[in-house]
């Protein structure tokens, strides 16, 4: 409908790169007048506001501030005396205990939405290399070939490919989708689940407080 010039008044996209494509194609209205009228620049976090600015004008505003998180089955951890990991050493230790129980460490999958690959890459880059190093790479102050990034991705390969932390194997990760990995987490097929904050409402409805 966008290509046909019949798109809706408000369009939702996965992020700024998609907005830029629409803006370059002349499909979006400049929002500067609305921003001035309603004071959006004062109400939004500066980086959030600037994420929708292209060629000096505002074309989009973010709906949410999102991040990747790890959910764990609290009851399952308590039953087995497992400590919620706060370091890499603790994470690898509890992962071994989870696998010894015949469960998967994490559940997650990319069937139907391949960008989940970058979710996991982002988790490892930010938690191993650190957000400052990632920022420096994004701004051109550091090379992506820096050893700290190489080590982060080698660790992801170790956990995901070599040890099958996500849904038991890389092949399973590729094969399962939203309903599958939520069901696996809810039925104790996996002790933990990686997920984005944008799914919290749907995730809570599917899993429940228990």
Residue ranges and their predicted role:
Residues 30-44, 127-151, 158, 205-209:
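Short, solvent-exposed loop/beta-turn-alpha elements that line the ligand-binding surface or hinge
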Residues 95-97, 139-173:
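Glycine-centered hinge/linker elements that transmit conformational signals in sensory
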Residues 14-68, 83, 92, 98, ...:
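Hinge/lid segment of periplasmic solute-binding proteins
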Residues 1, 16-17, 88-93, 170-183:
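Short helix-initiation/N-cap motifs at beta->coil->alpha
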Residues 15-19, 66-69, 76-77, 111-115, ...:
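Solvent-exposed loop/turn segments at secondary-structure junctions
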């Amino acid at each position: 409908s966008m290509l046909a010039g019949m798109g809706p008044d408000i369009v939702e996209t996965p992020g700024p790169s998609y907005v830029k494509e629409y803006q370059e194609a002349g499909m979006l209205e400049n929002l500067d007048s609305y921003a001035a009228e309603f004071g959006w620049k004062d109400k939004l976090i500066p980086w959030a506001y600037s994420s929708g600015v292209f060629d000096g004008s505002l074309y989009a505003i973010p709906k949410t501030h999102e991040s990747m998180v790890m959910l764990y089955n609290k009851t399952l951890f308590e039953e087995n005396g497992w400590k919620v990991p706060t370091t890499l050493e603790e994470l690898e230790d509890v992962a071994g205990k989870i696998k010894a129980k015949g469960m998967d460490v994490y559940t997650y999958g990319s069937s139907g939405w391949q960008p989940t690959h970058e979710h996991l890459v982002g988790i490892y880059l930010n938690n191993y290399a650190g957000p400052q190093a990632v920022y420096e790479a994004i701004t051109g102050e550091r090379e992506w070939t820096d050893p700290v990034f190489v080590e982060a991705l080698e660790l992801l390969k170790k956990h995901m490919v070599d040890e099958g932390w996500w849904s038991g194997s890389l092949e399973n990760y590729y094969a399962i989708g939203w309903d599958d990995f939520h069901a696996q987490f809810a039925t104790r097929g996996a002790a933990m689940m990686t997920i984005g904050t944008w799914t919290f409402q749907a995730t809570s409805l599917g899993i429940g407080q228990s």
